[in-house]
């Protein structure tokens, strides 16, 4: 088996919102990479031994005092370096070039760059040709400052009308700088540029692919846990489901999955989880029906944050009780993924190389004395989904819309009651079913129904009804940081509303949420 970590790229983060996207793109090309904070030491870089280094973007100005700089060793390590946006500016400044503040000449959004010279980074890449026969590329800019003089040994590779050095290179040292963002889809040929850098310039092999990741994970799991028993809290979500499948392949019946049905799941979800993992895949699952326990704990509580804490606390209590019954278990498995590792540093950058394992379950008792198994901690969410498919998990389960950890506990506004949850489950199932039927489900980023604790007058036949209100919510977003409400067709919304009111006794009115984020959040609580 080839070593999937043999060839690797180091990405240094200066705080850009796009930095994780760079890492995901390099992984998509088939090369392993890690994302570290910019203030890494020479010793840490030497130990990691990257085949190439990417200096990512950031919000600071290179011209400001005490702004972040790449470690000097980056330029003496003998490996290719690619500077993106701020990364290009700090590369230029540190190697003897000059950066000036852009006064009213920043570039934000779509731009077209004109190629001035040949470069390995742009080999055979072209979007259009101008009247002078020069190649043009469509790119995405987001910068105020700009390089005004490039370092000795560099050549200008591309320009725009307001940016004389939109790209630069020193082919001898294999140093490259681009003022635009190749990692975003708006830069049409961005993936080809990153592929040239990782595969051709750095000489990496594309070993990072789902089948190899699975093979590597299983081997590492076997080495880590040996013949010991492992317990896992299986929620039916993407991360814990993929962890369950990896461990099942690695250690079989030595894995015990604890599935806690808190009564706050989607319609028939508990049944589906048990049938898929227990009956179909043959995993060893302990099913805990804890609906009454959760609802009793939530009784009388209307505050969203308090509800979240109660749900988390009760889950931990139940999981702890079940874990103690597994007297031979030596390990606790968790679905920690790479963004969790990065974010646990307490900042957007995250020094992933010095982060210790952490409990993402939310405060499991220290006296459990179990080792931690986190087979997904190197992976982004899209990679987890891809290996889930390779492991045989169904597409519809892996690519479902996000569902909050507290479940319906934060989609029933105010106090949570069984009656409300049952009504909401059925209404939500109708909404999702109709989205699938209309081929709209995969065209929105997230869709769900919210139960409003208010009654409204309705008419049914010759009689009046005085029943509950639900709100439909559907949004379109790229990163869930901002979102637009989805402009679903009126006839579709009418069909969903009619079905919910006619088929569910207890709901008299359906409304549609047309709030964006900001100012609203995606979830109501």
UniProtKB/Swiss-Prot annotation:
It catalyses: XMP + L-glutamine + ATP + H2O = GMP + L-glutamate + AMP + diphosphate + 2 H(+). GO terms for cellular component: cytosol. Keywords: ATP-binding, Glutamine amidotransferase, GMP biosynthesis, Ligase, Nucleotide-binding, Purine biosynthesis. Residues 208-400 form the GMPS ATP-PPase domain. Its EC number is 6.3.5.2. Residues 8-207 form the Glutamine amidotransferase type-1 domain. One of its GO terms (molecular function) is GMP synthase activity. SUPFAM superfamilies: Adenine nucleotide alpha hydrolases-like, Class I glutamine amidotransferase-like, GMP synthetase C-terminal dimerisation domain. ATP binds at residues 235-241. The active site is at 85 (nucleophile), 181, 183. Pathway: Purine metabolism; GMP biosynthesis; GMP from XMP (L-Gln route): step 1/1. NCBIfam families: guaA_Cterm, guaA_Nterm, PRK00074.1. Catalyzes the synthesis of GMP from XMP. Homodimer. PANTHER family: GMP SYNTHASE [GLUTAMINE-HYDROLYZING], GMP SYNTHASE-RELATED. This is GMP synthase [glutamine-hydrolyzing]. It comes from Shewanella sp. (strain MR-7).
């Amino acid at each position: 088996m080839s070593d999937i970590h043999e060839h690797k790229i180091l990405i240094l983060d200066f705080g850009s919102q796009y930095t994780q996207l760079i890492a995901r793109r390099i992984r998509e090309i088939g090369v392993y990479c890690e994302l570290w904070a910019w203030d890494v030491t020479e010793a840490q870089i030497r130990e990691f031994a990257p085949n190439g280094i990417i200096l990512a973007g950031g919000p600071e100005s290179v011209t400001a005092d005490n702004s972040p700089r790449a470690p000097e060793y980056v330029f003496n390590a003998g490996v290719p370096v690619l500077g993106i946006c701020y990364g290009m500016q700090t590369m230029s400044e540190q190697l003897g070039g000059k950066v000036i503040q852009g006064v009213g000449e920043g570039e934000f959004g779509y731009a077209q760059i004109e190629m001035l010279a040949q470069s390995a980074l742009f080999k055979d890449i072209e979007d259009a040709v101008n009247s002078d026969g020069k190649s043009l590329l469509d790119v995405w800019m987001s910068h105020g400052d700009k390089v005004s003089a490039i370092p000795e040994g560099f050549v200008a590779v591309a320009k725009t009308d307001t940016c004389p050095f939109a790209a630069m290179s020193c082919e001898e040292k294999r140093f490259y700088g681009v003022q635009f963002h190749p990692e975003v889809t708006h830069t049409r040929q961005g993936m080809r540029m990153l592929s040239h850098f990782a595969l051709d310039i750095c000489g990496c092999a594309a070993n990072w692919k789902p089948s190899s990741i699975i093979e590597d994970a299983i081997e590492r799991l076997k080495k880590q846990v040996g013949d010991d028993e492992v317990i896992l809290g299986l929620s039916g979500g993407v991360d814990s489901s993929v962890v369950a499948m990896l461990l099942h392949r690695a250690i079989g019946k030595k894995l015990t999955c604890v599935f806690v049905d808190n009564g706050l799941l989607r319609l028939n979800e508990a049944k589906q989880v048990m049938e898929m993992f227990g009956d179909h895949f043959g995993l060893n699952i302990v099913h805990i029906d804890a609906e009454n326990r959760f609802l009793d704990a939530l009784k009388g509580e209307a505050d969203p944050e308090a509800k979240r804490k109660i749900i988390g606390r009760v889950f931990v209590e139940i999981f702890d009780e079940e874990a103690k019954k597994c007297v031979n278990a030596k390990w606790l498995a968790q679905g920690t993924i790479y963004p969790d590792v990065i974010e646990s540093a307490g900042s957007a950058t995250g020094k992933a190389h010095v982060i210790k394992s952490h409990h993402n379950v939310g405060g499991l008792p220290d006296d459990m004395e179990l080792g931690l198994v986190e087979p997904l901690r190197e992976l982004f969410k899209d990679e987890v989904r891809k290996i889930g498919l390779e492991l045989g998990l169904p597409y519809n389960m892996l690519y479902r819309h996000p569902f909050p950890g507290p479940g319906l506990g934060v989609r029933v506004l105010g106090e949570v009651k069984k009656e409300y949850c049952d009504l909401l489950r059925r209404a939500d199932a109708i909404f999702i079913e109709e989205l699938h039927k209309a081929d709209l489900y995969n065209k929105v980023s997230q869709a769900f129904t919210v139960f409003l604790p208010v009654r409204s007058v309705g008419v049914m036949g010759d009689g009046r009804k005085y029943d509950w209100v639900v709100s439909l919510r559907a949004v379109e977003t790229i990163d869930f940081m901002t979102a637009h409400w989805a402009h679903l067709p009126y006839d579709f919304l009418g069909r969903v509303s009619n079905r919910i009111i006619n088929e569910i006794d207890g709901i008299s009115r359906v409304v549609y949420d047309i709030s964006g984020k900001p100012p609203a959040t995606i979830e109501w609580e």
